[in-house]
Curated annotation (Swiss-Prot):
It is found in: Cell membrane. Residues 1-15, 87-110, 176-198, 261-295, 416-514 are cytoplasmic. Keywords: Cell membrane, Glycoprotein, Membrane, Phosphoprotein, Transmembrane, Transmembrane helix. Residues 430-450, 494-514 are annotated as: Disordered. Involved in endoplasmic reticulum (ER) stress-induced cell death pathway. Signal peptide: none annotated. This is Transmembrane protein 117.
Amino acid sequence: MGKDFRYYFQHPWSRMIVAYLVIFFNFLIFAEDPVSHSQTEANVIVVGNCFSFVTNKYPRGVGWRILKVLLWLLAILIGLIAGKFLFHQRLFGQLLRLKMFREDHGSWMTMFFSTILFLFIFSHIYNTILLMDGNMGAYLITDYMGIRNESFMKLAAVGTWMGDFVTAWMVTDMMLQDKPYPDWGKSARAFWKKGNVRIILFWTVLFTLTSVVVLVITTDWISWDKLNRGFLPSDEVSRAFLASFILVFDLLIVMQDWEFPHFMGDVDVNLPGLHTPHMQFKIPFFQKIFKEEYRIHITGKWFNYGIIFLVLILDLNMWKNQIFYKPHEYGQYIGPGQKIYTVKDSESLKDLNRTKLSWEWRSNHTNPQTNKTYVEGDMFLHSRFIGASLDVKCLAFVPSLIAFVWFGFFIWFFGRFLKNEQGMENQDKTYTRMKRKSPSEHSKDMGITRENTQVSVEDPLNDPALVCIRSDFNEIVYKSSHLTSENLSLHLKESTSEVEAEQEPAASQRMRTN
């Protein structure tokens, strides 16, 4: 590999730095974000509707409860079916011809996002039914989730930690197992491949660090504002840019993959903490219902990048919070030095009265329950709010917008099958041109096996880039750089299996005749 831009962009050090910086940035923005301390109800666009639709705001009547459950169950079912057959197969596979979605690749991630979409749609259908009744306005589904912002942000922080850690670990695991950069980390690779080192390290580090992370986040054991003592305090503009760069880094992790944007390589990425690059779950076979036996198959690469796109949802919500942040909407106000204070008493948060949510009012009025000023009972944050205009804050989305454009550009121009390649989605990346005889033409060749098959390898059409493998069964042309003993073995195995499949019915027919 020549030492060009791609060499350095996809270098192991570059990939590992980006993967681990995302973890640090996510913790930093969680600590600096004033929303993380807000006592008001959390609201998340679309996701909040889905969460509220499934988990809370159930009417008292049994009939209404049954209706609601049936609607969100129907939404999940339709979402799974539409995600698999409409979005994955039709839209991504046939219409857009995206290589990364060939066969069943990426189907579970597509089905997940499709399910969210249909839960959102059915929540509005449910709202329409409630409005028709006239007396059910209190049970309307909105993007408010029924939990406090503080609790939701803690859950989001733990979720992003898990997702970012698994992603960073898989990047590290890949760097230490594969060999596109053979001169990098020789001693580390030798240690990594010894026995079960990578397996033991993963589970040990995961349980240890996750226990510490959950303990610190959920118990407020460590206070960031007491720890940093106001060192380089952030404002809404700097936090918006930080959230934007987190989105950029999420996309960079995917774009730095050696097989981006097609993901059609022959490198199997082992799942973290396991010896296998994929997991299979057998669905119970009911012959009366299903005509075939179905299995759930999850590959390491889609397991990794599927998690990234889930984390991307939380990061987008974090970016939204910074861009449209207004202190009074989150039960907060601005004190001296443009510092943010968080109101903790529930009485002041009932109506979010802007008069009571101010430094002037809370510093001059006494709480009768504590005989102290309201300010003394509020939480002081070193984070600042300078009142920047929306235009200035929206500039923070420019880096993310550029990253999304480049991401789409590479997929559109380099990650799609050509029109004349339609129908080749199921072929291996080494496929160039294939001509097969019908198996019926070989039904007379009884007893032909792999051992007595004659195979010749020649140069087709005087093109040194191609190698032709011709056997008694068929002819296949490979790119010479991809020709391996495994390809040759697979080619012969596929050829003989087709003949054997046709021989078996013929043999059975002769037995019945005799």
